[in-house]
Amino acid sequence: MSNVKRKDSKNRNLRNGESQRKDGRYVYKYTDIYGKPQFIYSWKLVPTDKTPAGKRDDISLREKEAQIKKDLNDGIDTVGGKMTVCQLYDKKNSQRKNIKRATEKGRQYLMNALKNDPLGMRAIDTVKQSDAKEWAIRMSEKGYAYKTIDNYKRSLKASFYMAIQDDCIRKNPFEFKLSDVLEDDTEQKVILTPEQEERLLAFMEKDKIYSKYYDEVVLLLETGLRISEFCGLTTHIDMQNRILNIDHQLLKDSEIGYYIETPKTKNGKRELPLTERAYQAIQRILKNRGKAQPLIVGGYNNFLFLNREGLPKVAGNYEGMVRGLIKKYNKYHTDKLPNITPHSFRHTYCTNMANRGMNPNTLQYLMGHANITMTLGYYAHGTSQSAKAELERLAC
């Protein structure tokens, strides 16, 4: 075997695996952890070399070699690290197929956002924390809400964690607090005080247009149901035992129309005892219910709440109704009500129950929350009035 060293165009000795192409670019050949040959390239052999005019600047071949050797010694998959962020996110999603339709659509939205952003086509082993932060800033500049960006960041963090577990990369570039990069401009959850709740219902009861929604709003305030659970209620209610059985949601999609989903969380299936106020509201709703179209959705029919066409109401119907209700109320009253959504009634219910001293575990069950932290920290809002009342109670 010849001991003659191969040299480059500058008469420098080349190491094993190194070579120089006719166009002047350096090549390093190595074997990956799967026993397959791989190649890396650079216009520079060592860091002090200058990149030829018109060529993209990059680190030197020797620097790349050092990183590869370190990765191979540590068992890092140098090939896997070359997959793009889009490919990584797709791989992560492929490992969990049994998901709700809303989750699937959320995945599509994030994938589309990645495809339309420079980050999506980046090799995962080139993504640094500064790149992830710049991505968050770009998303904000494009008009994405803070909460949406935070949810997307959480998904990407999980994807990169999988890449770490697979020995494709060493660090997670999404391991940072979004609030350190962007201002959290998420609007606080709006709840109605008991006095506001009373004023709103009094207005609805007398109004020619909104009086027909009175009992539905009462039922929302008395049960704390998610609006999709509320829309899924049917006429098959256990009125004798005064129980609402919650085991599904009714939703509507522009692509497939009405469809049924299981409750949002594993704790979503529950039996809600009806208060006297809720019981009376349901009786009136059943009495005044119009004629329903013959419709079966996911095995369910005879939905309780119908629109003018006799079809089931969905979240969008109530969102529009509540917007109009608040707008009309505020038009004729100086003591304005805050802008709310149907979900605000759920916040209000949870807060009312917490302020009345309901056992946290019982409240968690009634709300169908996944964990107690959500019950206590996310929904239960204290007010100056409730704080004063609680202090007065403790002083007795």
Language-model segments: what does each one mean?
Residues 38-40, 44, 49-50, 260-284, ...:
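C-terminal catalytic core of Y-nucleophile DNA break-rejoin enzymes
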Residues 255-260, 356, 377, 381-396:
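DNA/chromatin major-groove-contacting recognition/catalytic segments
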Residues 21-26, 32-133, 287-299:
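N-terminal DNA-binding module of tyrosine recombinases/phage integrases
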Residues 152, 165, 169-171, 175-227, ...:
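Basic, Lys/Arg- and aromatic-enriched nucleic-acid-binding interface segment
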Residues 52-57, 93-168, 186, 208-209, ...:
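N-terminal core-binding DNA-recognition domain of tyrosine site-specific recombinases/integrases
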Residues 232-290:
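Conserved tyrosine-mediated DNA breakage-rejoining catalytic core shared by Y-recombinases
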Residues 15, 146, 202-213, 272, ...:
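Short, basic (Lys/Arg/His-rich) helix/loop patches that form interaction surfaces
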Residues 236-244, 358-377:
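Short, polar N-cap/turn motifs at the start of nucleic acid-interacting alpha helices
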